[in-house]
């Protein structure tokens, strides 16, 4: 597809006036060759393995950004799941040592975030998984760049309720800034460029570049220019805008890959918001005709938007990766955060919207004194949606000490202001104490 002069002008307007940017360039590196039996040896091997890549990463990204005239917001690193690296070591103290090392190494080379401090526990917990869980809260509370997740459910194996409950305990022991870097997930793909879900998957090459795009302001402007359009016309206009946004991600990915000399992996099609004015997914939904995001019609509007983004983005890239849909992180979207604080958006509304988007319950403030039963039940609800709808979803909750519904907690930067939401009138949910594994659903049988 070629751009005519009018379309070129539109892209320039997107870059200059509509906050179009690349959210993240994520370098994903296989760190399993650095596994050793002592944590000190593992750290030495990791340093030797990662430094040649990291020395070139930020200079390469800045060179491409300058040459193309595109703003690239963050530079990120994803490593192999750290729980695997902990298998021969198996203690929480080593978990924390690895965390501090990775955090310091990232700072040394100008890397904004490191993903992969993670474990896959959807069918059970291994020695390395246990070591990671035991040290995870201290690791995240004591670092600023580290991000991680626990994958506790999958369509193929069901939901590990023991891991769900342990995840709830971890969330409640995290400081707000640390909680913003931790998620509980299901069905997580191997090539996610967004944090905290990024990690180097077992099926990937030794190193690969994955790209995360942004651009809600672009789509909002398109929608506002069509106040009388029918649903089909609106869908087509969003689809065309998504093509242009994602095509930029493809170009940046190819150029950075060439500069670094590593393969280009995929572009995550997801349109990600930020706390800036004019960079909101919720504002798009309201421009489509909702009186307020969270009102009746919100799930339909989001479904229409996500479908258009997927179809437009898929045509623009050589390889689709990550979560590829739309993100509705409450605190990272100024309009969504305000609606949550007002009570227009509730936890149940967000659960319903999770059925048609890709993030689940994301960046939601909860009272710091919330019970572990309630937090575990919230996680279990989203894991059920992921397993029985056969899709990736996650939960990222931010406990706010002393916070009450309607309060804000300012995390700053891309995380924005967390709105504390009403989560439950109940404090005890005995179902969450049953433990065990909920078996996979019928979708598992369809896969053979």
Curated annotation (Swiss-Prot):
It comes from the Archaea. CDD domains: RNR_PFL_like_DUF711. InterPro entries: UPF0210 (IPR007841). Pfam families: DUF711. PANTHER family: UPF0210 PROTEIN MJ1665 (PTHR37560:SF1), UPF0210 PROTEIN SPR0218 (PTHR37560). Belongs to the UPF0210 family. This is UPF0210 protein PAE3581. It comes from Pyrobaculum aerophilum (strain ATCC 51768 / DSM 7523 / JCM 9630 / CIP 104966 / NBRC 100827 / IM2).
